[in-house]
Amino acid sequence: MSSARTVRKDKPRGRHHGLTQQKRQEIKEAFELFDTDGSGTIDAKELNVAMRALGFEMTEEQINQMIADVDKDGSGAIDFDEFCHMMTAKIGERDTKEELMKAFRIIDQDNNGKISPEDIQRIAKELGENFTVKDIQDMIEEADRDRDGEVNVEEFLRMMKRTSYAY
């Protein structure tokens, strides 16, 4: 037997290793519930209802794009594995966005919905960083699209999306 043909047993099987068993079960139940014709697949209309039930509001174009992204046979419908793969990505996006929202609220000390230069100075000091006024001004200008001198939540999320924290 050639060592090149040895199969590794410790490798995770399947495409769903990023999900908890409970989350996978919820996705399976949603799939079965919304596979209304019992075909073993979900079409665009069924997917839209399933996504809303799982807490995602989506446009018809987004639904059709999601199907196109995972529909390997071009049938216009997706099976459970495709649905699970797609939902793993969507849940990851939502979790990352929730984490970014928590970070925004921590930085926005006065809870006015905007990150000010003072907010950045305070959090930097708490983290042991020492930024100059110019450093902070540059950070704000990088993200501040409406040019009000502060960073609102949309600007913050857009900025973070351009970095390694993409959601």
UniProtKB/Swiss-Prot annotation:
Family matches, as SMART domains: EFh
Entry binding sites for Ca(2+) 3: D108, D110, N112, K114, D119
Residues that bind Ca(2+) 1: D35, D37, S39, T41, E46
Sequence positions that bind Ca(2+) 2: D71, D73, S75, E82
Single GO MF descriptor: calcium ion binding
Ranges of compositional bias, category Basic residues: 1-18
PROSITE patterns assigned: EF_HAND_1, EF_HAND_2
Entry's Gene Ontology BP terms: cell division
Protein name as it appears in the record: Caltractin
Species assigned in the record: Atriplex nummularia (Old man saltbush)
